[in-house]
Amino acid sequence: YECYHCPGIHPELCRIMPLYREGLQSYTDSRTGAPHGDASDSRARVGPGFATWTLDGQSKLPLIDGPSEADRALGVVFASFTASFFIVMHPDYVRTVRLSPRGPEQVELTVDWLLPPGVAERHAGELEKMVELGRMVVAQDGRVCELNQQGLRSRRHRQGVLMPQEEPLHEFHEWLHRRLVAA
C-alpha cells in the first residue's frame, strides 16, 4: 500500500513511522513484490524508541490483551474492509475510521478510539495524548483533500491514471463500476 503523500503532509507521523518517509505503508513494493527495506515482516513498524501512535511514540495506557508480541512490536496493524472503513490496532488502543459519502463533493468522516472496559476512567489523563496525533493526521488529510477537490474543479484538470501503489483504489473503482452497470 502507498502513503505517497505522507512525507510532505504528515511530518509528525513520518517521525514515528520511518517507512512512511518513503511514501510506502508496507515493506513489500506492490509493483514488484520485492522486499523493500530490511524488515523480515512486510508490515511497517514504528521506529526505534517508539511504541505507539502518539506524538512522542509513548503511552501509559495498559496494553490490549490478545495481540501477539510481534504485532505489538509493530506499533500498528491495519485491517481494511472496504474502501471506506478500516480498523487500526495499536498496542494500547484500537481506532476505527469510517468514510460515508454525503454527496458528490462531501464525505462524513467518523473516527472512534476504542479502549478495553474501564481504561478510559482509570487513565483519563492519558486520553488526550492518545487522540492528539490521530486528530492531527485527520486534519492534515482533510486540508489536502480540500485542495485536491479544488483542483478537480479546475478547467485545466485532466483525468489521469492510478499509480501502481493505488491497487486497492483501482479494485474499488472496478467494484463500483460493476455495481453501476448492473443497476
Language model features by range: what are they?
Residues Y1-A183:
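C-terminal catalytic domain of Rieske-type non-heme iron oxygenases
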